[in-house]
């Protein structure tokens, strides 16, 4: 059974601010989760052009996070089978990620994201069919809330109480009850997650586990977007691209893959039209 769920994450940012925040948080959280044995290896990061998405940046990454897998899954899957590969096409305000696992060749997870300057009440922003809408679940995530489930523990939990936090640089916060309907600026990340694990006996259980993991990741990363606002506020996309380039090199060096570190990042000037990749 294919799971389809749309997560709506309302943020107290403008669309322009959120783009910077997300880039910064992804970079920092990848650094925090990468050690000499596990973490994120960046295979490639380069410009792309696509008829549907326009221009953006394509990235290919390998996630070696075997220790974060549920115990029940590790009982019948080897550590190498739990390595996953992500391809992502970021043409902000539209993004798409496709995640596959070589150890489970039929498994596929896609995350389609559309960002809008609203407070989470837009319907069917992804243009789903009637059949897809009937199967889709919708959940609005409140970043001022906290979670204590298994996946929140695995992903990590911020100790910052956003109901009390106030940004020193912007004066924003705290996020009190009803903040999503009152704050300005405001925007929403509409994340449509589709998971298909067509394996008899454990496929449904793994689909549910992965969806719970995605929810925990969305909550924690977006809580960090606001909790770390004084770190990223004022940065430009050009500054962030340079920081990303340095971070990607550092990640690959941490994992002992200097060759990947040297070749992973390609600038627009270095990218030929023939080498650009379209969205899958």
Q: What do the predicted segments below correspond to?
A:
Residues 1-280:
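Eukaryotic helix-grip
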């Amino acid at each position: 059974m294919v799971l389809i769920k749309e997560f709506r994450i309302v943020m107290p940012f403008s669309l322009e601010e959120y783009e910077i925040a997300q880039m910064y948080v992804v970079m920092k959280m990848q650094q925090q989760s990468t050690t000499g044995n596990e973490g994120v290896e960046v295979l490639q990061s380069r410009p792309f052009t696509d008829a549907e998405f326009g221009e953006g940046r394509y990235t290919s990454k390998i996630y070696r996070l075997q220790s974060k897998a549920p115990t029940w899954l590790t009982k019948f899957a080897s550590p190498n089978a739990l390595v996953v590969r992500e391809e992502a096409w970021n043409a902000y305000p539209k993004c798409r990620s496709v995640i596959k696992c070589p150890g489970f060749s039929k498994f596929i997870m896609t995350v389609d994201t559309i960002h809008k300057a609203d407070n989470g009440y837009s319907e069917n922003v992804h243009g789903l069919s009637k059949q897809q809408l009937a199967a889709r679940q919708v959940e609005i995530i409140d970043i001022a809330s906290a979670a204590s489930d298994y996946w929140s523990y695995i992903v990590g939990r911020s100790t910052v109480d956003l109901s009390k936090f106030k940004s020193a640089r912007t004066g924003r916060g705290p996020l009190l009850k009803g903040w999503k309907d009152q704050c300005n600026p405001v925007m929403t990340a509409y994340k449509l997650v589709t998971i298909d694990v067509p394996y008899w006996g454990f496929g449904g259980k793994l689909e549910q586990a992965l969806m719970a993991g995605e929810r925990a990741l969305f909550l924690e990363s977006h809580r960090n977007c606001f909790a770390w606002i004084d770190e990223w506020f004022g940065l430009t996309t050009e500054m962030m691209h340079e920081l990303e380039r340095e971070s990607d090199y550092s990640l690959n060096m941490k994992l002992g893959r200097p060759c990947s570190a040297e070749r992973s990042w390609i600038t627009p000037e270095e990218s030929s039209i023939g080498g650009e990749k379209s969205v899958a």
